[in-house]
Amino acid sequence: MQPVPEGVYRHKINREKPTHDTKGDHMENNKEKRIIFATGNAGKMREIRAILSDLGLPVLSMKEAGVVLDIVEDGKTFAENAKIKAMAVWKQTGGVVLADDSGLAVDYIGGEPGVYSARYMGEDTSYEIKNRNIIERLANAEGKERSARFVCNITAVLEDGRVIQREAAMEGLIAK
């Protein structure tokens, strides 16, 4: 398992719905506030908007916020990559920025593809081909040797530059 950077915690995700109306629990003056999500991925934008819908704040993509950056994700951990993205956008906007980095880490092959999940075997390689390659590399692995996890780090940079990071992992086994 990848070491967890200082300030990042592995935890189980609480999927319980609030027992009260949460619209109004957050920030009194939402009219001028917004959140920028450091991604160009339309699927991720749909997901994050659904997750944050109770805040009553607009959640903008980089493009919608007028941010044009080619961010190099050269961190060695999911936390480092998420922070690199969030800080790059925050430096341009000064507002609240969220970024994530996620991927699959397979123990038998040394934690690969890990932080390189999106670029594993090339960015234009389909997930079907990437998955087939991983399964082939696990041909001699049995039982718990096939252990893996999907890791997601979410990083927030607040208006004042404070950084908050959370990371969770979903443990499992790669099927044959």
Segments the model singles out, each with a brief description of its role:
Residues 10-26:
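Short, Lys/Arg-enriched N-terminal segments with co-localized hydrophobic residues
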Residues 4:
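Charged DNA-binding/catalytic regions of mobile-element recombinases
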Residues 28-36, 42-61, 66-176:
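Anionic-ligand binding patches
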